[in-house]
Amino acid sequence: MSDRNPLIDADRRADEDNTLRPQTLDDFVGQAAARANLKVFIEAAKVRGEALDHVLFVGPPGLGKTTLAQIMAKELGVNFRSTSGPVIAKAGDLAALLTNLEERDVLFIDEIHRLSPAVEEILYPAMEDFQLDLIIGEGPAARSVKIDLAKFTLVAATTRLGLLTTPLRDRFGIPVRLNFYTVEELEYIVRRGARIMQMGISSDGAREVARRSRGTPRIVGRLLRRVRDFALVAGADIIDRRIADEALSRLEVDNRGLDQLDRRYLNIIARNFGGGPVGIETIAAGLSEPRDAIEDIIEPYLIQQGFLQRTPRGRVLTAVAWQHLGLPAPAEIIQQSQYGLFMEDE
């Protein structure tokens, strides 16, 4: 047993969170195609001595959109400013941000789909012409003022590409879609995180944490810290598969990475609505969760793992979901599954 003090103070936890984040594109694990393209665009911008074109990251939460934005600023050697769509309440807030940017700085706006229409209108000329068009005064005394801005790079992130207006979406020269990570990529992240936290972990222990992390690095970091806590209290020098499994089971994360909320979602559709189809508003009411949270956080992983189908009539559970819940699937679901296997054989 190590003589390290398991009582870690808040400062160290904050440092640990920052250290777990990769600092360069070479350190960043996963998203190989996106990283390769970003390297080219960053290098080209540096050679030209110009600001990088505006970048839009699209994907579920926790896949590294903010981290990639920070890395891009570091690789470009410029300042990084960060905010989010809901924080920019009025045009003046955006104007204050933009006028404080220096040449080629990176401005990161998370949840850009939540910008108000008035703020979005101000953003168009800022992105395209690097100018602010502001109305000063009211009534007959009102006048239009143009303010020149430093040539900056806007890096934006969204989980809901469909909520972006076409004029805003078209102004991003570099759209980047991020996908869920493979178990192998997450396993590497787990081992790296364990080294940083000075905690031993076996190969099967790392894989157990990785495969139950919903394909998401942010969840990997959270689960690894909690598994580490269980291991320390148990007096273990190394996290093996048994310790990881016990810790994750106590955290109610099952062997497919589904947590309590995921299982409630599946059970509501299965037990209350016979497996669907059922509308999203009905599910949201049953879970007492907002629709956005369900569509952004719960459903993407369930769909990717084959538990759920979105149809014009509503959400429908697949045979995989019924099997995972340990419930008998309706006859039509079994028939569809058998028909799919038959078509594959053909």
From Swiss-Prot:
Report the catalytic activity.
Answer: ATP + H2O = ADP + phosphate + H(+)
Gene Ontology MF terms: ATP binding; ATP hydrolysis activity; four-way junction DNA binding; four-way junction helicase activity
Q: Positions of the region Large ATPase domain (RuvB-L)?
A: 1-181
EC number(s) on record?
3.6.4.-
Q: Where is this region: Small ATPAse domain (RuvB-S)?
A: 182-252
Residues reported in the UniProt entry to bind DNA: R291, R310, R315
Bridged cysteine pairs (disulfide): none
Keywords, A to Z? ATP-binding, Cytoplasm, DNA damage, DNA recombination, DNA repair, DNA-binding, Hydrolase, Nucleotide-binding
Matching InterPro entries, A to Z? AAA+_ATPase, AAA_lid_4, CbxX/CfxQ, DNA_helicase_Holl-junc_RuvB, P-loop_NTPase, RuvB-like_N, RuvB_C, WH-like_DNA-bd_sf
Q: Name one GO biological process term.
A: DNA repair
Region (Head domain (RuvB-H)) residue spans: 255-346
Entries under Gene3D superfamilies matching the protein? 1.10.8.60, P-loop containing nucleotide triphosphate hydrolases, Winged helix-like DNA-binding domain superfamily/Winged helix DNA-binding domain
Q: Where in the cell is it found?
A: Cytoplasm
Residues annotated to bind ATP: L20, R21, G62, K65, T66, T67, E128, D129, F130, R171, Y181, R218
UniProt remark on domains: Has 3 domains, the large (RuvB-L) and small ATPase (RuvB-S) domains and the C-terminal head (RuvB-H) domain. The head domain binds DNA, while the ATPase domains jointly bind ATP, ADP or are empty depending on the state of the subunit in the translocation cycle. During a single DNA translocation step the structure of each domain remains the same, but their relative positions change.
Record's function text: The RuvA-RuvB-RuvC complex processes Holliday junction (HJ) DNA during genetic recombination and DNA repair, while the RuvA-RuvB complex plays an important role in the rescue of blocked DNA replication forks via replication fork reversal (RFR). RuvA specifically binds to HJ cruciform DNA, conferring on it an open structure. The RuvB hexamer acts as an ATP-dependent pump, pulling dsDNA into and through the RuvAB complex. RuvB forms 2 homohexamers on either side of HJ DNA bound by 1 or 2 RuvA tetramers; 4 subunits per hexamer contact DNA at a time.
State the family it belongs to: Belongs to the RuvB family.
Q: How does it assemble?
A: Homohexamer. Forms an RuvA(8)-RuvB(12)-Holliday junction (HJ) complex. HJ DNA is sandwiched between 2 RuvA tetramers; dsDNA enters through RuvA and exits via RuvB. An RuvB hexamer assembles on each DNA strand where it exits the tetramer. Each RuvB hexamer is contacted by two RuvA subunits (via domain III) on 2 adjacent RuvB subunits; this complex drives branch migration. In the full resolvosome a probable DNA-RuvA(4)-RuvB(12)-RuvC(2) complex forms which resolves the HJ.
> By what name is this protein known?
Holliday junction branch migration complex subunit RuvB
